[in-house]
């Protein structure tokens, strides 16, 4: 099926919304309803454009933001709370999946790296 411009525009709006609301849990269904398209169509367009589903992409954005916070001295529990993770364990699970180490290890590596600059 060829891309549907209406669906792609909705996917871009969802992406922009996620960037501005990292800590909020997104409801793809509610967003799609607002856009007058089905959730399935929105997810399909989003995945075609960004290679991940909206939920996967939002998690990647949150973990990337956690990296920034940790690099700037935040602790994992503060980062988890600020970015909408249910708790520090949730951040740690997602962080390990995406980055390959715990938030604490990442922060320690970043801190050790600063001493060499």
Task: Give each language-model segment a name.
Residues 17-20, 48, 72, 97, ...:
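Residues within well-ordered alpha-helical secondary structure of globular protein domains
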């Amino acid at each position: 099926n060829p891309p549907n411009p209406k669906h792609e525009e909705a996917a871009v709006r969802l992406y922009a919304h996620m960037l501005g609301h990292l800590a909020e849990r997104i409801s793809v269904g509610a967003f799609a309803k607002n856009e007058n398209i089905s959730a399935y169509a929105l997810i399909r367009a989003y995945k075609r454009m960004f290679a991940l589903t909206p939920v996967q992409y939002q998690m990647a954005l949150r973990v990337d933001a956690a990296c920034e916070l940790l690099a700037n001295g935040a602790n994992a529990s503060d980062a988890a709370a600020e970015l909408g993770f249910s708790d520090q364990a949730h951040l740690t699970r997602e962080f390990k999946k995406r980055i390959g180490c715990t938030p604490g290890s990442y922060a320690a590596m970043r801190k050790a790296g600063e001493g060499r600059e």
